Amino acid sequence: MQPTMRIIVSMALLAYAVASAYHSNVKLRRDGKMVLYPFPRVGRASGNTWQLPLNDLYPEYEPAQVKRQLYAFPRVGRDPVMSRLGRSDLSRVESHEFQPMAVRRTESPGMWFGPRLGRAFKNDDDEITIQNESNDHSEPEQTELIHEDRRKRQTLN
C-alpha cells in the first residue's frame, strides 16, 4: 500500500475506535447537571433542628440508609433574622404579624410596571397616520377579528 493510503486507513480506524469508546463508555459525561444530587434536600429552619432523632421519624429504616438518602442543606439566601429564629418563634411568623400590608389603589392612571405598560387611557399621539398613501403598500391589519362560520368536515364512517 502507498503511505498516504496507510495514513488514511489508520486515521479512519482510529476515529472509529475513539467514537465507539466514546459512545459505549459506562462513565457518564460531566456537564453542568452532574454535580447535583438526585436526593431530597432537607432544609433546617434553625440550629436547634439540626440534630433530629432519625429513629423516631423513620422507625422502619436503618439509620445508615436514611442518612444516605437525605442531605441537610442550610437555607441559603434567606433573611438572617428568620434563620436565627427558634422553633418556638416560628408560630409567631405564621401569625398575622408578618403578613404583607394591603396595597392602596389610586385612581390615577400612572405607570405600573414601567413605561408603556399598563396604560389605562389612549393618547391622541397614539393614532397611526399613513403619510404616503399609494397602491404599492398593503392594507393595515384589522384590529377586530371577523368571526366566520366554519363547516364541519365530512368524514367517512
From Swiss-Prot:
Subcellular localization, as worded in the UniProt entry: Secreted
Primary residence: secreted
Residue ranges of the TM segments: none
Gene Ontology process terms (BP): neuropeptide signaling pathway
Modified residues (Pyrrolidone carboxylic acid): 69
GO cellular component, one term: extracellular region
Basic and acidic residues biased stretches: 134-151
Region (Disordered): 131-157
Sequence positions bearing Leucine amide: 85, 117
Residue list for modification Valine amide: 42, 76
Pro-peptide region(s): 22-28, 45-66, 120-157
One function term, GO molecular function aspect: neuropeptide hormone activity
Keywords: Amidation, Cleavage on pair of basic residues, Neuropeptide, Pyrrolidone carboxylic acid, Secreted, Signal
InterPro entries: Pyrokinin_CS
Tissue: CAPA-periviscerokinin 1: Expressed in corpora cardiaca (CC), corpora allata (CA), antennal lobe (AL) and gnathal ganglion (GNG) (at protein level). Expression detected in most animals in CC and CA and in some animals in AL and GNG (at protein level). CAPA-periviscerokinin 2: Expressed in corpora cardiaca (CC), corpora allata (CA), antennal lobe (AL) and gnathal ganglion (GNG) (at protein level). For non-pyroglutamate form, expression in AL detected in all animals, in CC, CA and GNG in most animals (at protein level).
Coiled coil: none
Family under the similarity heading: Belongs to the pyrokinin family.
Name of the molecule in the record: CAPA peptides
Gene source species: Agrotis ipsilon
